[in-house]
Amino acid sequence: MGKTGLRVYMVGGIQGMTYDECVKWRVNVGKVLEAYGIEALSPMRGKAYLQREVSIKDSYEQHKMSTKAAIFARDKWDCLRADFILCNLLKASSVSIGSMFELAWAQDHGKYIIVVMEDEGNPHIHGFVQESASLVVSSLDEAVRHLLVVANVYDENQVKALELPKLD
C-alpha cells in the first residue's frame, strides 16, 4: 500500500487489445500515482505471459491467473478494496463488458469513480456509465489531476501547474 494508504483500481478494456495497449497507460498512470503515495492496482499485473498475444481473449484457462473465475474474483476484489476507480475508455471500438461490471460494483459500493472517454463517438456514452461516474473527463491527464486533488495529496491550484509525463 502507498504512503497515503489510498488505492486506485485502473479499469479499462482488455479483450481484443494488445498487451501493450492494455499495460502502457496503466504503467504510466501508476508511476505518477505512486509518486504521490497512492497504490495503483492493475488487472494486468502478473500477466506478462500475454505479451505475445495480438488480440487478448476474455480468458485463458491454461493460466491460473487468467481463468474466467480467477479474472472475475481478483478484479472484483481489487475494485472493492480500492478507494478510487480510474476507468479509461478512450479509443474504445466496442463496449468493454468487464469494465461495465467493475463500474457497477464500484458505484454500488460508494467508490469515487473517474471515467475517461471522448465526448462523442465512444460506444460507452450511455446514461448508466455517465451516472455511475463521480466525474467524466476526456483525458488521462485531467483524470490524474482531479484524482490527486480529490485524494487530498495535491492542492487544486498547484495541480494545474504540475508537469505530468505523457500518460496514454
Predicted regions mapped to residue ranges:
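Conserved catalytic or regulatory cores that recognize and/or transform ribose-phosphate-containing ligands
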Residues: 1-168
